[in-house]
From Swiss-Prot:
Family annotation (Pfam families): DUF436
The name this protein goes by in its record: UPF0340 protein str1894
Family as reported in the entry's similarity comment: Belongs to the UPF0340 family.
InterPro entries membership: Antibiotic_NAT-like, DUF436
Length: 187
């Protein structure tokens, strides 16, 4: 996959997921990324710093003008901690942890987040409103309930399977209750 094609497909994916998940300024968007899978390898075995940089930079170019924060999930070697802007961590009172990602502990996406964010820190956990999983990294633990699967308009990025999640408030009250319109499914 050519790098410009990778950037364009990433941009299309993120713009589509942001629109369909109905998130806006102040929201958090989580990224799970296996650059190994993108280049056709096995998750965690062929990490590519350049692929991570291209994807994260492109995602930030889409999210930042909309006021949406990016949280980049690390691998299980870092207990799936996330890189976020310090501003977000302090505003949301997130638990900051002391670790610096490497290519094989945290991964290429986290390294890229440290390259492109203004004041990046690692946090232990987060509850994002939506997210994208590039390479079956399992982002579900970081997306708030109730999670709504979104079928991405592009199902693979390079060799990586792509899935996405949005979230909506819980519906409570049962048969007698009335609800606001669902902005994700647009009932």
């Amino acid at each position: 996959m050519m790098l410009l094609d990778l950037e364009e497909k990433t941009r299309v994916l993120i713009e589509d997921i942001v629109e369909r998940s109905a998130i806006g300024s102040g929201s958090i968007f989580v990224l799970g990324l296996s650059s190994s899978e993108v280049i056709g390898g096995i998750i965690g075995k062929a990490s590519s710093r350049e692929i991570g940089q291209r994807i994260v930079k492109t995602i930030l170019e889409v999210l930042e003008p909309k006021g949406i924060y990016l949280a980049v999930q690390g691998c299980e070697h870092l207990n799936r901690a996330l890189v976020v802007e310090r501003e977000l961590a302090l505003a949301k009172d997130l638990e900051i942890v002391n670790v610096l990602p490497t290519l094989h502990a945290g991964g290429s996406g986290q390294l890229a987040a440290f390259d492109y964010m203004e004041d990046p820190v690692e946090v232990e956990e987060i509850l994002a409103q939506a997210g994208i999983d590039i390479g079956d990294t399992s982002i579900g633990m970081h997306v708030k309930r109730v999670q709504v699967p979104l079928r991405p308009i592009i199902s693979e990025l390079g060799g990586a399977h792509v899935t996405a999640l949005a979230s909506r408030p819980k519906l409570i009250g049962g048969a007698r209750a009335e609800y606001l319109a669902d902005p994700i499914r647009k009932n």
